[in-house]
């Protein structure tokens, strides 16, 4: 059982990292929700709703670690939105492809943030948490890069005879 530390006694950069990460996860969740609300395509809306929920779960995981480590929940003012990196918000005229590119960049930034956080923290529990979040964010990057590739490749590789139901009776 990890001994609870006082927030004031914590000398490590971990506290600041977790507070910033919490703010960023909330911001990402809100961005995906906003994008979803603006889309008409149901499959695209669902994808962004799922991403919004995933980012919310990342926030909840961070918050749980914070509560278990310090024995209290962070106050809103403790979440350092002022030092959080600005997420590029797509312009109103952005198409789906533009939005996917922004998301890839955002998720890559999250990977880098958590990789750096894992290197900087001296807290083993936090290090494990950050390494887990790197894997989750990396999965998001892969998912959207694959989708972008499928959208932008001029042709997918398959033979005409592989297409089902392309026959006459």
Question: Which role fits each region the language model picked out?
Answer:
Residues 1-169:
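Non-heme di-metal
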């Amino acid at each position: 059982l990890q001994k609870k530390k006082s927030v004031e006694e914590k000398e490590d950069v971990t506290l600041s990292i977790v507070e910033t990460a919490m703010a960023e996860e909330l911001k990402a969740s809100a961005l995906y929700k906003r994008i979803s609300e603006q889309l008409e395509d149901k499959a695209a809306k669902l994808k962004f709703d799922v991403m919004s929920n995933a980012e919310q779960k990342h926030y909840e995981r961070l918050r749980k670690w914070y509560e278990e480590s310090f024995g209290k929940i962070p106050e809103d003012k403790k979440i350092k939105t002022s030092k959080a990196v600005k997420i590029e918000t797509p312009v109103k005229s952005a198409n789906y492809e533009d939005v996917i590119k922004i998301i890839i960049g955002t998720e890559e930034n999250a990977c880098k943030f958590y990789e750096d956080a894992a290197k900087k923290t001296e807290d083993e529990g936090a290090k494990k948490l950050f390494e887990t979040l790197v894997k989750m964010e990396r999965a998001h990057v892969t998912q959207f890069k694959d989708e972008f590739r499928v959208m932008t490749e001029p042709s997918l590789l398959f033979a005409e005879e592989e297409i089902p139901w392309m026959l006459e009776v």
